[in-house]
């Protein structure tokens, strides 16, 4: 491979990192308080939830890329691989939020309510009267579910794009998958640091921090891309 053949994979890796970082800001993460239904969102950490969706997206993308007749040099096939990643991630996170919601509503007996908005931007439902005193919301309201689904789609797209770039660099499918997982984690952790705790979704004031996180991932992914190209060249 000559130097010019590395430009496209480097650009794809850099863009993928920025997309992954942006996706994490959409995911409704309530952390440990949400596990006790005292905070809005899913009861786990930012990185874990985003990475879970991203891994599923990577598996879906890898499955599509391995199909007979699929070529990474074909733009239509690349789009199909990326869409497969997006759909896989959306299914994973959608089911996670759905099962969590069932437990919150029927197991704990709370009404899903967002603390960071007066009305749900999607349904227009008033939120504050339904928030239990002493909590910062609970459950997964409609706006959080929609935001999480968008985040999962972006995460799946970013992860799939990184996988495509790694295969274009000549890495075997298994190695490309391992490297893509590590790459996804790197950007998810950067986003987690940028958020600084919990986030409800695109309606949360912390969502405004996203540009800083995207810039950080853009730079770090560019450096990571250069390292990966060096690995592909055998340096």
Swiss-Prot record:
Similarity comment: family membership: Belongs to the MtrD family.
Catalytic reactions of this protein: 5-methyl-5,6,7,8-tetrahydromethanopterin + coenzyme M + 2 Na(+)(in) = 5,6,7,8-tetrahydromethanopterin + methyl-coenzyme M + 2 Na(+)(out)
Transmembrane segments: 15-37, 49-71, 86-108, 143-165, 169-191, 212-234
Broadest EC class assigned to this enzyme: translocase
One of the GO biological process terms: methylation
Alphabetical keyword list: Cell membrane, Membrane, Methanogenesis, Methyltransferase, One-carbon metabolism, Transferase, Translocase, Transmembrane, Transmembrane helix
EC numbers on record: 7.2.1.4
Cellular compartment(s): Cell membrane
Major location (coarse): membrane
This protein's GO CC annotations: cytoplasm; plasma membrane; vesicle membrane
Signal peptide limits: none
GO MF term set: tetrahydromethanopterin S-methyltransferase activity
Membrane topology designation: Multi-pass membrane protein
Function noted in UniProt: Part of a complex that catalyzes the formation of methyl-coenzyme M and tetrahydromethanopterin from coenzyme M and methyl-tetrahydromethanopterin. This is an energy-conserving, sodium-ion translocating step.
Name of the protein in question: Tetrahydromethanopterin S-methyltransferase subunit D
NCBIfam families in UniProt: mtrD
Naturally occurring in which organism (per UniProt): Methanococcus maripaludis (strain DSM 14266 / JCM 13030 / NBRC 101832 / S2 / LL)
Keyword Disulfide bond part of the UniProt annotation: no
Disulfide bonds, paired cysteine numbers: none
Subunit structure of this chain's protein: The complex is composed of 8 subunits; MtrA, MtrB, MtrC, MtrD, MtrE, MtrF, MtrG and MtrH.
This protein's record includes keyword Membrane: yes
Pathway stated in the Swiss-Prot or TrEMBL entry: One-carbon metabolism; methanogenesis from CO(2); methyl-coenzyme M from 5,10-methylene-5,6,7,8-tetrahydromethanopterin: step 2/2
């Amino acid at each position: 491979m000559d130097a010019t053949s590395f430009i496209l994979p480097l650009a794809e890796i850099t863009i993928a990192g920025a997309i992954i970082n942006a996706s994490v800001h959409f995911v409704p993460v309530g952390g440990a308080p949400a596990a006790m239904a005292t905070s809005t969102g899913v009861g786990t950490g930012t990185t874990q939830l985003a990475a879970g969706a991203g891994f599923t997206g990577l598996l879906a993308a890898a499955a599509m890329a391995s199909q007979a007749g699929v070529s990474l040099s074909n733009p239509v096939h690349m789009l199909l691989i990326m869409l497969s990643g997006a759909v896989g991630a959306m299914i994973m996170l959608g089911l996670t939020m759905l099962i969590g919601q069932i437990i919150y509503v029927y197991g704990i007996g709370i009404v899903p309510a967002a603390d960071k908005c007066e009305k749900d931007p999607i349904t227009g439902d008033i939120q504050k009267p339904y928030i239990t005193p002493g909590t910062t919301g609970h459950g997964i309201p409609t706006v959080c579910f929609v935001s999480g689904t968008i985040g999962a789609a972006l995460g799946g797209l970013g992860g799939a794009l990184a996988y495509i770039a790694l295969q274009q660099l000549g890495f075997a499918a298994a190695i490309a998958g391992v490297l893509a997982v590590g790459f996804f984690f790197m950007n998810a952790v950067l986003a987690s640091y940028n958020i600084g705790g919990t986030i409800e979704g695109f309606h949360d004031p912390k969502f405004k921090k996203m540009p800083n996180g995207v810039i950080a991932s853009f730079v770090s992914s560019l450096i990571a891309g250069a390292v990966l190209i060096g690995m592909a060249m055998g340096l």
